[in-house]
Amino acid sequence: HGVLRKGATGKALTPDLTLEKGLEYLKVFIKFGSPGGMPNWGTSGVLNDEEVDLMARYIQQTPPAPPEYGLKEMEASWKVVVPVEQRPTKKMNDLDLENLFSVTLRDDGKIALIDGASKKIVSILETGYAVHISRMSASGRYLFAIGRDAKVDLIDLWMDPPSTVAEIKVGAEARSVESSKFKGYEDKYAVAGTYWPPQFVIMDGATLEPLKVVATRGMTYDTQEYHPEPRVA
Protein backbone atom coordinates (compact mmCIF):
# COMPACT_ATOMS: atom_id res chain seq x y z
CA HIS A 1 0.00 0.00 0.00
CA GLY A 2 3.05 2.25 0.18
CA VAL A 3 4.82 3.79 3.15
CA LEU A 4 2.43 6.77 3.09
CA ARG A 5 -0.49 4.45 2.21
CA LYS A 6 -1.26 6.30 -1.01
CA GLY A 7 -1.33 3.04 -2.97
CA ALA A 8 1.32 0.81 -4.54
CA THR A 9 0.86 -2.90 -5.28
CA GLY A 10 -2.14 -2.66 -2.95
CA LYS A 11 -4.77 0.07 -3.08
CA ALA A 12 -4.59 3.38 -1.21
CA LEU A 13 -5.46 3.26 2.50
CA THR A 14 -5.73 6.95 3.30
CA PRO A 15 -8.23 8.21 5.93
CA ASP A 16 -10.55 9.76 3.34
CA LEU A 17 -11.16 6.23 2.04
CA THR A 18 -10.97 4.15 5.21
CA LEU A 19 -13.20 6.43 7.30
CA GLU A 20 -15.86 6.22 4.61
CA LYS A 21 -15.76 2.40 4.72
CA GLY A 22 -16.24 2.34 8.48
CA LEU A 23 -14.60 0.35 11.26
CA GLU A 24 -16.67 -2.84 11.00
CA TYR A 25 -16.14 -3.12 7.23
CA LEU A 26 -12.38 -2.76 7.69
CA LYS A 27 -12.29 -5.38 10.45
CA VAL A 28 -14.10 -7.93 8.29
CA PHE A 29 -11.86 -7.16 5.32
CA ILE A 30 -8.69 -7.54 7.37
CA LYS A 31 -9.87 -10.69 9.13
CA PHE A 32 -11.27 -12.62 6.15
CA GLY A 33 -9.39 -11.12 3.20
CA SER A 34 -10.79 -10.79 -0.31
CA PRO A 35 -10.86 -12.63 -3.67
CA GLY A 36 -8.79 -9.76 -5.07
CA GLY A 37 -5.70 -10.80 -3.16
CA MET A 38 -6.00 -9.30 0.32
CA PRO A 39 -4.70 -11.96 2.77
CA ASN A 40 -6.98 -13.27 5.50
CA TRP A 41 -4.87 -11.94 8.35
CA GLY A 42 -7.38 -12.94 11.02
CA THR A 43 -8.56 -16.42 10.05
CA SER A 44 -5.01 -17.43 9.08
CA GLY A 45 -3.91 -16.83 12.65
CA VAL A 46 -1.47 -14.01 11.91
CA LEU A 47 -3.60 -11.47 13.80
CA ASN A 48 -6.04 -12.09 16.65
CA ASP A 49 -9.34 -10.19 16.93
CA GLU A 50 -7.83 -7.51 19.15
CA GLU A 51 -5.02 -6.91 16.67
CA VAL A 52 -7.45 -6.84 13.75
CA ASP A 53 -9.46 -4.16 15.58
CA LEU A 54 -6.28 -2.19 16.30
CA MET A 55 -5.16 -2.38 12.67
CA ALA A 56 -8.58 -1.25 11.41
CA ARG A 57 -8.43 1.78 13.69
CA TYR A 58 -4.84 2.50 12.74
CA ILE A 59 -5.49 2.72 9.00
CA GLN A 60 -8.22 5.28 9.70
CA GLN A 61 -5.53 7.64 11.02
CA THR A 62 -3.28 9.88 8.93
CA PRO A 63 -0.04 7.97 8.28
CA PRO A 64 3.05 9.65 9.74
CA ALA A 65 6.02 10.19 7.43
CA PRO A 66 8.91 7.93 8.49
CA PRO A 67 12.30 9.46 9.32
CA GLU A 68 14.61 10.40 6.49
CA TYR A 69 17.78 8.39 5.88
CA GLY A 70 20.67 10.13 4.20
CA LEU A 71 24.40 9.88 3.62
CA LYS A 72 25.24 10.46 7.30
CA GLU A 73 23.08 7.54 8.42
CA MET A 74 24.47 5.31 5.67
CA GLU A 75 28.05 6.09 6.63
CA ALA A 76 27.27 5.24 10.27
CA SER A 77 25.99 1.80 9.22
CA TRP A 78 28.76 1.08 6.71
CA LYS A 79 31.19 -1.64 7.70
CA VAL A 80 34.12 -3.13 5.78
CA VAL A 81 34.59 -6.60 7.28
CA VAL A 82 37.57 -7.54 5.12
CA PRO A 83 39.53 -4.65 3.54
CA VAL A 84 40.31 -4.95 -0.17
CA GLU A 85 44.04 -5.38 0.45
CA GLN A 86 43.36 -8.37 2.73
CA ARG A 87 41.19 -10.23 0.24
CA PRO A 88 42.47 -13.06 -1.98
CA THR A 89 44.30 -12.16 -5.18
CA LYS A 90 43.07 -15.36 -6.80
CA LYS A 91 40.14 -17.75 -6.34
CA MET A 92 40.76 -19.88 -3.24
CA ASN A 93 37.95 -22.44 -3.71
CA ASP A 94 36.88 -24.90 -6.39
CA LEU A 95 33.44 -23.39 -7.04
CA ASP A 96 32.40 -23.06 -10.67
CA LEU A 97 31.47 -19.38 -10.66
CA GLU A 98 30.26 -19.66 -14.25
CA ASN A 99 27.57 -22.12 -13.13
CA LEU A 100 26.63 -20.99 -9.63
CA PHE A 101 23.15 -20.05 -8.46
CA SER A 102 22.36 -17.63 -5.63
CA VAL A 103 19.02 -18.62 -4.09
CA THR A 104 17.12 -16.48 -1.60
CA LEU A 105 16.10 -18.16 1.68
CA ARG A 106 13.78 -15.29 2.49
CA ASP A 107 12.23 -16.27 5.82
CA ASP A 108 15.55 -17.52 7.16
CA GLY A 109 17.46 -14.37 6.24
CA LYS A 110 20.06 -16.26 4.25
CA ILE A 111 21.33 -16.97 0.74
CA ALA A 112 22.18 -20.44 -0.53
CA LEU A 113 24.84 -20.91 -3.18
CA ILE A 114 23.95 -23.88 -5.37
CA ASP A 115 26.22 -25.60 -7.87
CA GLY A 116 24.51 -25.58 -11.26
CA ALA A 117 25.87 -28.98 -12.29
CA SER A 118 25.29 -31.05 -9.15
CA LYS A 119 22.32 -28.98 -7.87
CA LYS A 120 23.87 -29.25 -4.41
CA ILE A 121 24.07 -26.44 -1.86
CA VAL A 122 27.74 -25.52 -1.56
CA SER A 123 27.41 -22.67 0.92
CA ILE A 124 24.82 -20.84 3.03
CA LEU A 125 25.42 -17.21 3.98
CA GLU A 126 23.76 -15.05 6.64
CA THR A 127 22.53 -11.86 4.99
CA GLY A 128 19.82 -10.40 7.23
CA TYR A 129 16.08 -9.88 7.33
CA ALA A 130 13.87 -10.81 4.38
CA VAL A 131 16.47 -11.08 1.63
CA HIS A 132 14.89 -9.85 -1.59
CA ILE A 133 17.41 -10.29 -4.39
CA SER A 134 21.07 -10.99 -5.08
CA ARG A 135 23.12 -9.87 -8.07
CA MET A 136 26.48 -11.02 -9.44
CA SER A 137 29.14 -8.46 -10.30
CA ALA A 138 30.37 -8.20 -13.89
CA SER A 139 33.52 -10.21 -13.13
CA GLY A 140 31.57 -12.87 -11.25
CA ARG A 141 33.73 -12.41 -8.17
CA TYR A 142 31.30 -10.49 -6.00
CA LEU A 143 27.70 -11.15 -5.03
CA PHE A 144 25.48 -8.29 -3.86
CA ALA A 145 22.45 -9.09 -1.69
CA ILE A 146 19.79 -6.75 -0.33
CA GLY A 147 17.02 -7.35 2.18
CA ARG A 148 13.70 -5.60 2.55
CA ASP A 149 15.22 -3.80 5.53
CA ALA A 150 17.59 -2.11 3.02
CA LYS A 151 20.72 -3.84 4.30
CA VAL A 152 23.22 -4.59 1.53
CA ASP A 153 25.81 -7.36 1.84
CA LEU A 154 28.85 -7.72 -0.40
CA ILE A 155 30.03 -11.33 -0.65
CA ASP A 156 33.44 -12.32 -2.03
CA LEU A 157 33.04 -15.57 -3.95
CA TRP A 158 36.82 -16.02 -4.27
CA MET A 159 37.16 -16.68 -0.54
CA ASP A 160 37.03 -20.17 0.96
CA PRO A 161 34.32 -20.30 2.04
CA PRO A 162 32.60 -17.33 0.33
CA SER A 163 32.15 -14.63 2.96
CA THR A 164 30.66 -11.19 3.50
CA VAL A 165 33.38 -8.55 3.11
CA ALA A 166 31.29 -5.38 3.48
CA GLU A 167 27.81 -4.29 4.50
CA ILE A 168 25.71 -1.13 4.67
CA LYS A 169 22.13 -0.10 5.40
CA VAL A 170 20.87 2.26 2.71
CA GLY A 171 17.38 3.13 3.97
CA ALA A 172 14.32 1.89 5.84
CA GLU A 173 12.87 -0.34 3.11
CA ALA A 174 14.33 -1.55 -0.17
CA ARG A 175 14.14 -4.16 -2.93
CA SER A 176 16.96 -3.63 -5.43
CA VAL A 177 20.73 -3.65 -5.83
CA GLU A 178 22.94 -3.93 -8.90
CA SER A 179 26.59 -3.51 -9.88
CA SER A 180 28.13 -1.68 -12.82
CA LYS A 181 28.62 -3.78 -15.93
CA PHE A 182 29.32 -1.14 -18.59
CA LYS A 183 32.63 -1.61 -20.37
CA GLY A 184 35.40 0.12 -18.46
CA TYR A 185 33.35 0.30 -15.26
CA GLU A 186 33.01 -3.41 -14.47
CA ASP A 187 32.73 -3.96 -10.69
CA LYS A 188 33.61 -0.31 -10.04
CA TYR A 189 30.25 0.85 -8.71
CA ALA A 190 27.11 -0.55 -7.11
CA VAL A 191 23.68 1.06 -6.87
CA ALA A 192 20.83 0.34 -4.45
CA GLY A 193 17.31 1.76 -4.69
CA THR A 194 15.01 2.22 -1.72
CA TYR A 195 11.26 2.34 -1.20
CA TRP A 196 11.84 4.67 1.74
CA PRO A 197 13.25 7.19 1.50
CA PRO A 198 12.47 7.33 -2.23
CA GLN A 199 16.02 7.54 -3.55
CA PHE A 200 18.99 5.54 -4.75
CA VAL A 201 22.60 5.50 -3.62
CA ILE A 202 25.74 4.93 -5.67
CA MET A 203 28.43 2.99 -3.80
CA ASP A 204 31.99 1.84 -4.33
CA GLY A 205 31.75 -1.62 -5.89
CA ALA A 206 34.52 -3.14 -3.77
CA THR A 207 33.72 -1.63 -0.35
CA LEU A 208 30.09 -0.38 -0.50
CA GLU A 209 31.28 3.06 0.59
CA PRO A 210 28.32 5.40 -0.13
CA LEU A 211 29.38 8.00 -2.70
CA LYS A 212 26.24 9.80 -3.86
CA VAL A 213 22.56 9.80 -2.90
CA VAL A 214 19.96 10.79 -5.52
CA ALA A 215 16.36 11.54 -4.50
CA THR A 216 13.47 10.60 -6.79
CA ARG A 217 10.81 12.86 -5.30
CA GLY A 218 9.42 15.39 -7.74
CA MET A 219 6.59 16.29 -10.07
CA THR A 220 4.66 13.68 -12.03
CA TYR A 221 5.19 13.77 -15.79
CA ASP A 222 1.52 14.15 -16.68
CA THR A 223 -0.37 16.27 -14.14
CA GLN A 224 2.76 17.96 -12.75
CA GLU A 225 1.70 17.19 -9.19
CA TYR A 226 4.25 16.63 -6.45
CA HIS A 227 4.83 12.93 -5.75
CA PRO A 228 6.25 12.30 -2.24
CA GLU A 229 6.91 8.59 -2.67
CA PRO A 230 8.20 7.45 -6.10
CA ARG A 231 9.73 4.18 -4.91
CA VAL A 232 12.90 2.85 -6.50
CA ALA A 233 12.36 -0.85 -7.19
PLM ranges: what are they?
Residues 39-107, 111, 116:
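Flexible coil segments in periplasmic/lumen-exposed cytochrome c-class electron-transfer proteins
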Residues 81-91, 130-136, 172-182, 219-232:
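Repeated scaffold domains used in trafficking and secretory/extracellular systems
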Residues 98-100, 139-141, 182, 186-188, ...:
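Short coil/turn segments that connect the beta-strands within blades of beta-propeller domains
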Residues 110-111, 151-153, 198-200:
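Structural signal for beta-propeller blades
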